């Protein structure tokens, strides 16, 4: 039979039914969109498994295409997520907007300590990186010397400090990202 129930997620005032057809179709499409590398990908699980995004990513997406899941401790959303990210070095990162907001807050806090040449290089790298990524979103060539220099000198160090040196894709679910956080 088609469209049989695979799982029910019970939330505070509601329930969500995930069907077998829905999960299978979504996994197939996600693997195409994310250019999934079989038995190579790893993700960090920090959302409760009662959260539909947490269940889909941490269980079904990994089972469908192979890979590893690093389970963060229960205090991940209270500040220990960074430790797990640095240890796991995820290849794909799936976050809810609040997690991206917290990462942005920490980055802004760290940037305040930069002065002189370090601040100039950091600002240049951020600007060049934004230009590069917005150009590639529009199908235009990105890069250039400023971007390559900024990536090598600044952005690679930031990525390593956050555990994202192997991360090739960042994805958001559950709610829209604000434009400020997206940048």
What does each model-identified segment do?
Residues 1-27:
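Conserved AMP-binding A3 loop
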Residues 161-165:
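Short, conserved loop/helix-junction motifs that constitute active-site signature segments
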